[in-house]
Amino acid sequence: MNRQGVRLLPDRGGSLAAFGVGLAVVIILLGMGRPPICPCGVVRLWHGVVESAENSQQVSDWYSFSHLIHGFLFYGAAHIVWRRFGFAELSPRWALALAVLIEGSWEILENSPIIIDRYRSVTISWGYSGDSVLNSAADIGFMAAGFLFAARAPVLVTVVLGIGFELFTLWAIRDNLALNILMLVWPVEAVRVWQGGG
């Protein structure tokens, strides 16, 4: 199949592989001692209060938008790898499974003491203590949804939607994917003060 004919959507095997990788991540997180659900004992589909012990503990929150964008970006990267450069060593049906592997690896790292401590020390994390396994699994699901959306939608629609999500969360909670990465890698005190309402 030529590059123009490459399909980045998973077939049944690719979908099962993606699910299997996600399940493995859940098992690893449970083995790390992460709480299965919010320690509060309540499961909510949405929790919109950032300054709360339930943030990053429920199915979705303001940061779910960032995980959708992860999916957009991973699809874009897969598009470059398979369509432009060719990647004959690996069938494109595994692109989603590879994206889940990358996202899942981040979820494991994000819930490790070194990253939790980093968030608490350099970002406006309001006592961040890691995610519940439910939240991490949902984050992976949102990434997969973003990937599959980008695989079907026109590039311009995906780009506009991604920028819209970033601007919306910036307005709503003074945080987004770009600022999250900036503050984690290269913290800027002025940004931290602004995020705190200063």
Curated annotation (Swiss-Prot):
**In the record, which residues are listed under signal peptide?**
none
Query: Could you tell me where this protein is found in the cell?
Result: Cell membrane
Q: Determine the domain of life of the protein's source.
A: Bacteria
| Keywords of the record | Cell membrane, Membrane, Transmembrane, Transmembrane helix
The UniProt transmembrane annotation reads 13-33, 62-82, 96-116, 153-173, 177-197
Does Transmembrane show up as a keyword for this record? yes
GO CC annotation, single: plasma membrane
Q: What InterPro entries is this protein classified in?
A: DUF2585
Bilayer disposition of the protein? Multi-pass membrane protein
Family the entry assigns: Belongs to the UPF0314 family.
Q: Which HAMAP family is this protein grouped with? A: UPF0314
Name of the protein described by the UniProt record: UPF0314 protein Saro_1818
- List the source organism: Novosphingobium aromaticivorans (strain ATCC 700278 / DSM 12444 / CCUG 56034 / CIP 105152 / NBRC 16084 / F199)
